[in-house]
Curated annotation (Swiss-Prot):
It is an enzyme of class 2 (transferase). It comes from Pseudomonas syringae pv. tomato (strain ATCC BAA-871 / DC3000). Its EC number is 2.7.7.66. InterPro entries: Holo-ACP_synthase, MdcG_C, MdcG_N. The active site is at D136, D138. This is Phosphoribosyl-dephospho-CoA transferase. Transfers 2'-(5-triphosphoribosyl)-3'-dephosphocoenzyme-A to the apo-[acyl-carrier-protein] of the malonate decarboxylase to yield holo-[acyl-carrier-protein].
Amino acid sequence: MIDSAFVVLPHDLLWGMPLSALPDDAPQWAVDTLLAGQPVVVRRQAMPAGQVAVGLRGRGREQRYAASMWLTNVYRRVTPEQLIDCPSEHIQDWPALRALRQVRPVMDALERVWGVGGSAGFELASGIAALNQDSDLDLILRTPAPFSRRCAAELVEALAASVCRVDVQLQLDQGAVALREWARPAGRVLLKTASGARLVSDPWHLAEVCA
């Protein structure tokens, strides 16, 4: 088990959620997911100390279930940053995985911490099939320090040549912003925080975010 004081972040994958953490009305597929030993993904939601909001995923896109668990039940954690090394021998070389190998030099050149989320991250971390021919590649870019709109626009342009759509979330200390939104020349963007979402002009401006 991992100490309850350790910090988890949205998009981290966790193993160890017990069946007892599911409410009685949870769908059977969610029960089956835990029985199969599959990980859950950390959600962005404020929780009491020692607990974390998580999401379970089934086989179909419509099978998503929000829940929570105690951190003391976690025995393994995989972060998006640990998944950037896409093995070339992966059993199914989906477009999203080819795109990951293709965009790695672009992402590495930013000299910021980044990682893989979404279906690609889930499959790489767990070995459980989650991707298909039409899957996008979801990336996480850690941006605790400001990332200019100009840099965002340049990154969007650089990623446009990849073999599938690449969606990037800018992860700030106070929430997350979609790269494509921030890459626009001007205008407010949607900042997703643990207490909800709001429109802001500058997501790194704490006075505005907290107002």
